[in-house]
């Protein structure tokens, strides 16, 4: 069952102060998503980051495109406060606004690049969110999105039990591609990435999951005990326990006027598998 937006915002509010300490996966996924811009002859004038969290990727986007207007949006007041406090001399370099990724408070066709690193995973209406990203893009604008895939934390699903991350949207790569085309994007190029993290013990793993809003109650006693028992099977030679993260990501262009733009409730499109480019890497 999807997590209601208000509950997600409150969850991120609670962990805002310690988020950056537990966001190693998010940071690596963001780095890989930005790499999709390498080699492109593309100079956006206006950039939106959906789910800007602590603002670090707004800074990275501004550094990459210093002449562009950069706007960071997040639904969590706590996260926005952290982003503002960490902005420092960047204050005049990028803007921060509060809003829902499925109902963007922005005009049609006002952005050249929309960037969303893992943030759409927490939106209960992902197809509507993708349609919103399409709406605010100008023709020939680019969207870069990444989400957690269905095999994220696969080795821990049994131990997590009712505390599982099942309330988060976990599309496979084909589903993400189909959703992008239904939203009106042209010929998405998709990747599946795998990230492995290592933790000193069960408590360290749960602390990272809680500190990145993937578990609402990482301190639950029965959860700690279940993860401790499972960790014996997942310990490497150095004595650390591992976790696997699947990241599905895409880049896609907004078509020129005259080509159809479809909302989540619009016309169904059948997509031949050979029309969706998929790459896999570790």
Predicted segments, located by residue:
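Conserved alpha-helix/loop element of class I SAM-dependent methyltransferases that forms part
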Residues: 24-45, 60
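A short acidic, Gly/Pro-enriched loop at the edge of an enzyme's catalytic core
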Residues: 102-113
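N-terminal, positively charged/glycine-rich alpha-helical extensions of SAM-dependent methyltransferases
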Residues: 1-18, 277, 282
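A short SAM/SAH-binding and catalytic strip from SAM-dependent methyltransferases
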Residues: 112-125
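Class I SAM-dependent methyltransferase SAM/SAH-binding core
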Residues: 46-104
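A short glycine-rich, Lys/Arg-flanked "PGG" loop and its adjoining helix->strand segment in the class I
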Residues: 127-139
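Conserved catalytic/acceptor-binding region of the Class I
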Residues: 140-202, 212-225
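Conserved Class I S-adenosyl-L-methionine
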Residues: 189-282
């Amino acid at each position: 069952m999807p997590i209601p937006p208000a509950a997600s915002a409150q969850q991120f509010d609670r962990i805002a102060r310690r988020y950056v300490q537990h966001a190693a996966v998010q940071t690596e996924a963001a780095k890989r998503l930005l790499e999709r811009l390498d080699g492109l002859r593309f100079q956006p004038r206006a950039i939106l980051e959906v789910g800007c969290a602590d603002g670090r990727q707004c800074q990275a986007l501004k550094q990459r495109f210093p002449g562009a207007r950069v706007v960071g949006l997040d639904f969590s007041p706590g996260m926005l406060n952290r982003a503002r406090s960490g902005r420092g001399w960047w204050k005049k370099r990028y803007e921060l606004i509060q809003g829902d990724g499925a109902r963007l408070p922005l005009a049609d066709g006002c952005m050249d690049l929309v960037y969303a690193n893992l943030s759409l995973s927490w939106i209960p209406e992902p197809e509507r969110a993708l349609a919103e990203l399409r709406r605010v893009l100008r023709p020939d604008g680019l969207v870069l999105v990444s989400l957690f895939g269905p095999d994220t934390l696969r080795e821990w699903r049994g131990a997590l039990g009712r505390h599982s991350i099942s309330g988060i949207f976990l599309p496979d790569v084909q589903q993400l591609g189909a959703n992008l085309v239904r939203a009106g994007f042209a010929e998405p190029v998709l990747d599946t990435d795998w990230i492995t993290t290592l933790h000193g013990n069960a408590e360290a793993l749960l602390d990272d999951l809680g500190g990145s809003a993937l578990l609402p109650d990482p301190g639950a006693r029965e959860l700690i005990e279940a993860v401790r028992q499972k960790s014996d099977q997942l310990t490497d030679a150095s004595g650390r326990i591992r976790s696997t993260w699947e990241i599905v990501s895409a880049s896609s262009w907004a078509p020129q006027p005259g080509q159809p733009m479809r909302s989540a409730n619009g016309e169904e499109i059948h997509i031949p598998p050979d029309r969706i480019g998929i790459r896999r890497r570790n």
